[in-house]
């Protein structure tokens, strides 16, 4: 289930997962918004290897991500991010994204030739089920018991004009 709340400052979103079955249910979730912003600033402590062989491998401990530093057509998989990212437009607009700790992972995507980027808070890394089955406990994959429920929220606040004016 998804719950949206729009107010004068921005948008709040809550995702709710419930296991209605009678067996344990592995799951992960996230949101996948597209933005026309040119840059995104965030801090993360882990960069996962790309899924595609066409994408470069890199290792950085703390990073500020911008469209220019991302490889077009590649997903950048991050973990241990601070749950905050700020998107910047060339005209001074900003969007502050804040996510619950349940969204411990983040994907940043740029498409070849596109004028957008995706900043996607997620509960798990790509291929989490296979990685977890191979013994990697850092993937964020969760298992819900029958009848169990899990939820997480995030907030997007938009600011026109003056850079740095967003409450964080």
Regions found by a protein language model. Name each.
Residues 1-3, 139-144:
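Beta-strand-rich interaction surfaces with strong enrichment in secreted/lumenal proteins
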Residues 90-130:
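Glycine-rich active-site loops that engage anionic ligands at enzyme catalytic sites
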């Amino acid at each position: 289930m998804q719950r949206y709340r729009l107010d004068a400052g921005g948008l709040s979103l809550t995702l709710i997962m419930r296991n209605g079955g009678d067996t344990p249910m592995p799951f992960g979730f996230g949101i996948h918004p597209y933005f026309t912003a040119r840059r995104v600033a965030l801090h993360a402590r882990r960069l996962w290897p790309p899924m595609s062989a066409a994408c470069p491998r890199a290792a950085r401990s703390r990073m500020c991500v911008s469209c220019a530093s991302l490889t077009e057509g590649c997903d950048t998989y991050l973990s241990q991010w601070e749950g905050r990212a700020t998107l910047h437009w060339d005209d001074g607009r900003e969007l502050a994204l804040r996510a619950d700790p349940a969204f411990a992972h983040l994907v940043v995507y740029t498409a070849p030739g596109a004028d957008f980027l995706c900043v996607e808070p997620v509960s798990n890394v790509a291929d989490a089920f296979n990685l977890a089955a191979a013994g990697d406990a850092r993937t964020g994959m969760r298992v819900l018991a029958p009848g169990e429920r899990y939820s997480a929220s995030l907030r997007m606040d938009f600011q026109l004009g003056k850079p740095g004016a967003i409450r964080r």
